[in-house]
Amino acid sequence: MFNKLIFFSIFLIFHNLFSQELTGKELLEKTINFHDPKNNWTDFQDSFTVKMITSDEKIRESLIEIDLYNELFSMSVIKDQNKTFTVIDKSECKIIFNGSESFSKEDQKKHRLTCKNAFKMRDYYTYLYGLPMKLKDPGTILDPVVKRKKFKEKEYLVLKVTYEESVGKDTWYFYFNPLTYAMEVYQFFKDESKNDGEYIILEDIVEVSGIKMPKIRSWFFNKDDKYLGKDILN
């Protein structure tokens, strides 16, 4: 038993030393190898359900289909007894609200029934559920220095990510398990000096088309740790 403890301690020491020497790019490759070992994201074609529960217990259920190979995206949302279906085919967009493509300006404003919002939601879901693979997209700037940091009493390897101005202005931090390289937390700031933005804790894993995706994402404000809600993937 004593020998096993010594071996494990030595393993952790060498693993930690190796992790400290990783560059941002090397860390990204290791976490992608954990989440998408067969490079399935490139031609991803599948669907999944996301149940969002806000802090005040409001529920929104979304059936999402992502077809990167054919540049298709669709989302069917049920909220407050209303059903919205959105489909994007390359640059074309169609919205159906409660079974009709015709709806009032009041409904359009209240339920955000615009193609601008549809493209925004497509980008949102393909980004978050495409992580960490999406960090290889053009315009992404990886900090070459990987840091070790404790977050909520747990130690992580942390990768800082910014973007070219044409892509985005937020600053992101991605927290990876130092043993498995699994992505377990991410955090973003609009203005880091103000401690704004949010952090998202990832729990459990669901495998979709060979890709390990987070089953539960819980959202909190950076400034006061206020709980905002969670998404559950099925």
Locate the predicted segments by residue.
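N- and C-terminal low-complexity/disordered segments
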Residues: 46, 60, 78-79, 87-89, ...
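Short, surface-exposed beta-strand/loop "edge" segments at domain boundaries and coil↔beta transitions
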Residues: 54-62, 80-86, 101-104, 166-171, ...
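Flexible, processing/modification-adjacent segments and terminal tails
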Residues: 20-26, 96-166, 193-196
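Catalytic loop of the DD-peptidase/beta-lactamase superfamily, centered on the K-T-G motif
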Residues: 84-94, 101-104, 110-115, 228-233
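Intrinsically disordered terminal and processing segments
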Residues: 23, 30, 34-38, 81, ...
